[in-house]
Each structure stands twice: as C-alpha cells, then as structure tokens.
C-alpha cells in the first residue's frame, strides 16, 4: 500500500460508540524501525479519540473472562497482561433501548464494557487480541482465536480459517478449526494434514495447535461478511447444520 502512496490508519469502534473511538497515530520515528516492528506498531488500535476519555484496559473475572467485572482494576501497561477494553466519553451510547438488564451489564462499574480483550502497551496504545467470548483457555493458557486463524491461513492451501473452543478433559478447552481451501485445492487437503503441518512445520506454538480441523465448502457469515462464530460453536457441539 505504501508503494501506491497509500497510508493505512488503524481505527477501532463499536455500534455503541457511533463509529471509531480509537486511532493508531503514526509516529515519524517508526520509519527508522525494522519493518516487522514498524508494521506491528501500525497494527495496534492506538489511542482514544479527543472526543472521549482515555481508553482503558481492565482485568476480567479470572473464572469467566466473558463476564465483565465491575471492579475496573487496570492491567499493567506491559503489552502482555490481557484485559477488557472499557470506554467513557461523549461518543458512548447512553443505554440499550428498553433493555435495562443489558444496559446494566454494558456499564458495569460506570464504564462501557466492549467485550474485546486486549493488551496495553507502555506508550498507552491498545492492541486487541480477541473477543472475550472467543478466547480459548487451554491448560491455563489464553489462546487468541484471531491469532491462531492468522497463523493457519499461512498454509499455502488454506483460504480462510475460524477457530472455536471445544471441551477437553485434560486441558479444559482446545481449539477446533474450521477452514476453507483455495480454488483448485478442493478435496486435496484433510484436517489431519493441517494438524500435522501445524505441529511440525508451521511455527505455531504447541499449545495452540488445533485438536480438530474440519474442511468446509464455505464458512457461515453475516450479510456483511462477518464470521458467525456462534454457529460454528454450535456445530462444534454437534448442532444441526442448516445454515
């Protein structure tokens, strides 16, 4: 994109914030960094809008990261500790229409809970790892489904990947991956081959390797192209496949 004189900017927002509420502000000294480090910083969701209070990341409930905590204890700004993004400011919605219980949960502790898990870097920039409900907790390790999907699509034959948690007696949860293959590769790649590649030739950490991989003709998506992981979670449990 830069070769075409295009300068990508990373923004982040929700329906409840009327659009973008953070922006990745480019720093000139980033041009002096190694390419991987430069683009890694550009990929962060950045800092809060001038129309909002500073974006914060707070600890989630240890036993249930999908359940927001009202204590609002901030995580360390070390780029490692994972927490939930919370927001305050004029861009935030007031309430859910005629839904007081959803409103109460959204604003638990006096801040808007996004349901997005992220880390907080020393310079104040945030970096999203996953949705709270999509994180896979395996043997005490937090596996970002987004990160695992990004690694799986580096396989030369995989077009798309979507990962969900499945129960595991030993580890609590393990990843299951649903994939589609590139044109011309239909019927030539099995789930077992993908698992073998992930274990031995991909560079994927062992604890992240999917326990199961299923090849689909297409992944279920909304009309806007968003993955319907709720359906994939149901399929992983043996639910009806009528979508």
How should these model regions be labeled?
Residues 1-11, 15-125, 132-135, 148, ...:
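Conserved AMP-binding/adenylate-forming
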Residues 4, 51-53, 110, 156-159, ...:
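Structural motif
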Residues 8, 55, 161-163, 213-215:
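Generic structural signal for residues in well-ordered beta-strands
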Residues 21, 175, 211-212, 230:
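Extracytoplasmic/periplasmic beta-strand context in beta-sandwich domains
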Residues 61-63, 168, 217-221:
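Short, internal active-site loops enriched in acidic
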Residues 89, 94-95, 104-105, 117-206, ...:
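AMP-binding/adenylate-forming catalytic core of the ANL superfamily
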Residues 203-226:
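AMP-binding/adenylate-forming catalytic domain of the ANL superfamily
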Residues 236-243:
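Acidic/polar alpha-helix N-cap and adjacent early helical turns
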């Amino acid at each position: 994109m830069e070769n075409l004189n295009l300068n990508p900017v990373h923004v982040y927002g929700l329906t409840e914030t009327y659009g973008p509420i953070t922006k990745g502000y480019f720093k000139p000294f980033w041009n002096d960094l190694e390419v991987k480090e430069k683009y890694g910083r550009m990929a962060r969701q950045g800092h809060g809008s001038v129309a909002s209070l500073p974006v914060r990341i707070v600890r989630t409930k240890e036993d249930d990261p999908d359940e927001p905590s009202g204590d609002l204890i901030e995580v360390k700004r070390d780029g490692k500790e994972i927490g939930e993004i919370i927001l305050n400011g004029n861009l935030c919605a007031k309430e859910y229409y005629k839904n007081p219980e959803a409103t109460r949960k959204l604003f638990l502790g006096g801040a808007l809970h996004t349901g997005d898990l992220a880390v907080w870097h020393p310079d104040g920039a945030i970096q999203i790892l996953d949705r709270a409900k999509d994180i896979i907790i395996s043997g005490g390790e937090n596996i970002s489904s987004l990160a695992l999907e990004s690694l799986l699509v580096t396989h030369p034959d995989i077009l798309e990947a979507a990962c969900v948690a499945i129960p595991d007696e030993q580890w609590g949860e393990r990843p299951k991956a649903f994939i589609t293959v590139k044109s011309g590769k239909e019927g030539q790649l099995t789930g077992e081959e993908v698992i073998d590649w992930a274990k031995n030739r991909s560079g994927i950490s062992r604890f992240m390797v999917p326990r199961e991989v299923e090849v689909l003709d297409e992944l279920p998506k909304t009309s806007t192209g968003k993955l319907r992981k709720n359906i994939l979670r149901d399929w992983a449990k043996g639910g009806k496949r009528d979508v």
